[in-house]
C-alpha cells in the first residue's frame, strides 16, 4: 500500500490542521513501512475541540431520544457496510490478521453501538412519593463533554465502546486514539458525521498521550474521562482528572489473569481455551489468561496438548485468510516483550516453545515474536507477576483447590479469571472466591455488549458495556414538588 496523505484532526464535523505544528508517524508493524504522517493536537487544539463539543452537545441533548437513536443506528448500518474497508485499515495499522479484524473489531464495536442506540429511549427517571401533598422525581441528565482515551490494541472497537454509551446518554465526546494506531478513529468520526451526528459531538484528536491526553484530563471543560491503558498511565490520568476539576473517571487497565484447569476438566477443551486466552491477537489482549494453573499430575499431558496446538498457529501475510497470528503492534513493544522473555529464561523458567523473534521471509522487517510457552514457572517470577501483553504463556502447577485460589488472587491485578471443569458446583464455588471483575467458566474472552466489563484492584474503576455504563454517563437530578402550602418557621 502506498503512503497515505497526512492525517489531520477531526473537529466540528470536518478535518482541520493542528495548531501545534507537530507530527508523528504511524507504522505498519508487519513490514516496518510508514503508513502516514499524523498531526498531533496541542493545547490550543484541545481548547477548540472542547468549545466545539460544548456547542454540539447542546444541540444533541435537545434532540428526542428517538432522534438520537435513529442517528446512531444509521452509524451502525454504515459501519457494517464498510466492515471490510475498515478492517483492512485496522490490519495495516495494528498488524492484526485480517481474519481477526474483519470478524471481530468492527463487528463487536458496531454491536455495542447498536445496543446503546436501542437503550436510549429507556433512559428515564423515577417518582418517589413522600406524602399525599409532596413527591420527588428524578431526571437522568447528560454530563456534558466527556473524553475518551484509547489503547492501541483495539482502536476502533475501543472508540465505539467509549463513544456509544456517552453519545447515547446525550453527551459529546472528544476521543484521543493511541498514537500507535490512530487511523480508524478518524474514519469513525467521518461515519458519525455522515450518519447525522451534529458537528462537535464526536471530535478526534490524535496526539502523544503524555501531552494531548494530559491536556484533556486537565481541561476544566471535560466532565468525565474514560481511559483504557496501563496501570501507571491510568494513575496519572486519574490524578490529573481529580486535581483539575474532580472529573468522573472510568479506568480499564491491565491484567495478569489466572486460568485454572481442574483435574476433572477435558484437557482438550482446557488447551483450546488456554490457546485463545494467550495467543489470540498475538497476546495483546488485556484480559488474557497468562497464568495457566494446571494440576501437577496433568502437567505433562497438558504441555503436549499445548505444543500440538501451537503447531496450528499460522503466522505470515496478514491478509491471507489462513493467517491467525500477526506481529506485535510496534517495534518498541516487540523489544519490551523480548526483554520479558529473556527475563523468564534468566529466572529459570523452561521454554517449551518459542522464546525468540520469528525469522525468515516475511518476518525480518516486522515486529514479529514467536508464540512462547514457559513451563516450570514459579509465582515470584517476573513473567508471572507482570503484564507482558504479548504471546507469552506461563504454566504453573498446583496441588489443591485452596492453594490455587490463594495463588490466583495473589496479584495486584483483578481484571479477569477463568476456570475449566466439568463440575458446576466446583465452578461456582471457586469463581465466587476469585478477585476479578470478568470471569469465565469453560470459555474465555467473549465480552458482548450486554456484559459489564471492568476490573478489581489495580485493573480499573467502573465498567464498560451493559446498562450500568449508560447510567454512568448521566448525572441524577432530584426535584421535590410540594402541593400544600409551604410552612416557614420564621
Curated annotation (Swiss-Prot):
Q: Part of which pathway?
A: Amine and polyamine biosynthesis; betaine biosynthesis via choline pathway; betaine from betaine aldehyde: step 1/1
What EC number(s) does its UniProt record assign? 1.2.1.8
> Where, by residue number, does NAD(+) bind?
150-152, 176-179, 230-233, 254, 286, 387
Which cofactor is essential here? K(+)
Q: Which UniProt keywords apply?
A: Metal-binding, NAD, NADP, Oxidation, Oxidoreductase, Potassium
Q: Does the keyword Ion transport apply?
A: no
Residues forming the catalytic site: 162, 252, 286, 464
Q: What Gene3D superfamilies does the record point to? A: Aldehyde Dehydrogenase, Chain A, domain 1 (3.40.605.10), Aldehyde Dehydrogenase, Chain A, domain 2 (3.40.309.10)
Residue numbers marked as site, Seems to be a necessary countercharge to the potassium cations? 248
| Co-factor remark | Binds 2 potassium ions per subunit.
The record, for InterPro entries, names: Ald_DH/histidinol_DH, Ald_DH_C, Ald_DH_CS_CYS, Ald_DH_CS_GLU, Ald_DH_N, Aldehyde_DH_dom, BADH
Q: Name one GO biological process term.
A: glycine betaine biosynthetic process from choline
Q: Which reaction does it catalyse?
A: betaine aldehyde + NAD(+) + H2O = glycine betaine + NADH + 2 H(+)
Q: Where does K(+) 2 bind?
A: 246, 457, 460
Positions modified as Cysteine sulfenic acid (-SOH)?
A: 286
**What's a single GO MF annotation on this record?**
metal ion binding
The UniProt entry, under CDD domains, shows: ALDH_F9_TMBADH
Q: Which Pfam families match?
A: Aldedh
Q: Which family does it belong to?
A: Belongs to the aldehyde dehydrogenase family.
The UniProt subunit note reads as follows: Dimer of dimers.
Sum up the protein's function in the record's words: Involved in the biosynthesis of the osmoprotectant glycine betaine. Catalyzes the irreversible oxidation of betaine aldehyde to the corresponding acid.
PANTHER family (alphabetical): ALDEHYDE DEHYDROGENASE-RELATED
- What is the name of the protein in this document? Betaine aldehyde dehydrogenase
Amino acid at each position: 500500500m502506498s503512503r497515505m496523505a497526512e492525517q489531520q484532526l477531526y473537529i466540528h464535523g470536518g478535518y482541520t490542521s493542528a495548531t501545534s505544528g507537530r507530527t508523528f508517524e504511524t507504522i505498519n508493524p508487519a513490514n516496518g513501512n510508514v503508513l502516514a504522517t499524523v498531526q498531533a493536537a496541542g493545547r490550543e487544539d484541545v481548547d477548540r475541540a472542547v468549545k466545539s463539543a460544548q456547542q454540539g452537545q447542546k444541540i444533541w441533548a435537545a434532540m428526542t431520544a428517538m432522534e438520537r437513536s435513529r442517528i446512531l443506528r444509521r452509524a451502525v448500518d454504515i459501519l457494517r457496510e464498510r466492515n471490510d474497508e475498515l478492517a483492512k485499515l485496522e490490519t495495516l495499522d495494528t498488524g492484526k490478521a485480517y481474519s481477526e479484524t474483519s470478524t471481530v473489531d468492527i463487528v463487536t464495536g458496531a454491536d455495542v453501538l447498536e445496543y446503546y442506540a436501542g437503550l436510549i429511549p429507556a433512559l428515564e427517571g423515577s417518582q418517589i412519593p413522600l406524602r399525599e401533598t409532596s413527591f420527588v422525581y428524578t431526571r437522568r441528565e447528560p454530563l456534558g463533554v466527556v473524553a475518551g482515551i484509547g489503547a492501541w490494541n483495539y482502536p476502533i472497537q475501543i472508540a465505539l465502546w467509549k463513544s456509544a454509551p456517552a453519545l447515547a446518554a446525550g453527551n459529546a465526546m472528544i476521543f484521543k486514539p493511541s498514537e500507535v494506531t490512530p487511523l480508524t478513529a478518524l474514519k469513525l468520526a467521518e461515519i458519525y458525521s455522515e450518519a447525522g451526528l451534529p458537528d462537535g459531538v464526536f471530535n478526534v484528536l490524535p496526539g502523544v498521550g503524555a501531552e494531548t491526553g494530559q491536556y484533556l484530563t486537565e481541561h476544566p471543560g471535560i466532565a468525565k474521562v474514560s481511559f483504557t491503558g496501563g496501570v501507571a498511565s491510568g494513575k496519572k490520568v486519574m490524578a490529573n482528572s481529580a486535581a483539575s476539576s474532580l472529573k468522573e473517571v472510568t479506568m480499564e487497565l491491565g491484567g495478569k489473569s489466572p486460568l485454572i484447569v481442574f483435574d476433572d476438566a477435558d484437557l482438550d477443551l482446557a488447551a483450546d481455551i488456554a490457546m485463545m486466552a494467550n495467543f489470540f491477537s498475538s497476546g495483546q489482549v488485556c484480559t488474557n489468561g497468562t497464568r495457566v494453573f494446571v494440576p501437577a499430575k496433568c502437567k505433562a499431558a497438558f504441555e503436549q496438548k499445548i505444543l500440538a496446538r501451537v503447531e496450528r498457529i499460522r503466522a505470515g501475510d496478514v491478509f491471507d485468510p489462513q493467517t491467525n497470528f500477526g506481529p506485535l503492534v510496534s517495534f518498541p513493544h516487540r523489544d519490551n516483550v523480548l526483554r520479558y522473555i529473556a527475563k523468564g529464561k534468566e529466572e529459570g523458567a523452561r521454554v517449551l516453545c518459542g522464546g525468540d523473534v520469528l525469522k525468515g521471509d516475511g518476518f525480518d522487517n516486522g515486529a514479529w515474536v514467536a508464540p512462547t510457552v514457559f513451563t516450570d514457572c514459579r509465582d515470584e517470577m517476573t513473567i508471572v507477576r507482570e503484564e507482558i501483553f504479548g504471546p507469552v504463556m506461563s504454566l504453573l502447577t498446583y496441588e489443591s483447590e485452596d492453594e490455587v485460589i490463594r495463588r490466583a488472587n495473589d496479584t495486584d491485578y483483578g481484571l479477569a479469571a477463568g476456570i475449566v471443569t466439568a463440575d458446576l458446583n466446583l465452578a461456582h464455588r471457586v469463581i465466587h472466591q476469585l478477585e476479578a471483575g470478568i470471569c469465565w467458566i469453560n470459555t474465555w474472552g467473549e465480552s458482548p455488549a450486554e456484559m459489564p466489563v471492568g476490573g478489581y484492584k489495580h485493573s480499573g474503576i467502573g465498567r464498560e458495556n451493559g446498562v450500568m455504563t449508560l447510567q454512568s454517563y448521566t448525572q441524577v437530578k432530584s426535584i421535590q414538588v410540594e402541593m400544600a402550602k409551604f410552612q416557614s418557621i420564621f
